């Protein structure tokens, strides 16, 4: 009888640990993305304008494609 209780306690503790880990990781990722948002086309356009470049759609598409390929 005590073996079953030990196994049950172990399984319950494992499930609680998995659930707790999931929510902690989710909260961390949400705060990380809030502090460091991913770059989109509008941000690239603004960066290029600040550097004195005239942002063409072709150049923006090339930069986005290069960034997406680098992230993989």
UniProtKB/Swiss-Prot annotation:
Membrane-topology descriptor: Single-pass membrane protein
Subcellular location: Cell membrane
Keywords, sorted A to Z: Cell membrane, Membrane, Transmembrane, Transmembrane helix
Pfam families: UPF0154 (PF03672)
Transmembrane segment boundaries: 4-24
Any one annotated GO CC term: plasma membrane
NCBIfam families membership: PRK01844.1
UniProt record similarity statement: Belongs to the UPF0154 family.
HAMAP family attached to this UniProt entry: UPF0154
Protein name: UPF0154 protein RBAM_017710
Species for this entry: Bacillus velezensis (strain DSM 23117 / BGSC 10A6 / LMG 26770 / FZB42) (Bacillus amyloliquefaciens subsp. plantarum)
């Amino acid at each position: 009888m005590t073996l079953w209780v030990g196994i049950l306690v172990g399984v319950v503790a494992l499930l609680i640990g998995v659930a707790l880990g999931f929510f902690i990781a989710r909260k961390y990722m949400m705060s990380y993305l809030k502090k460091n948002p991913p770059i989109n086309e509008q941000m690239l356009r603004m960066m290029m304008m600040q550097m004195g470049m005239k942002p063409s759609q072709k150049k923006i598409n090339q930069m986005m494609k290069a960034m997406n390929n680098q992230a993989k």
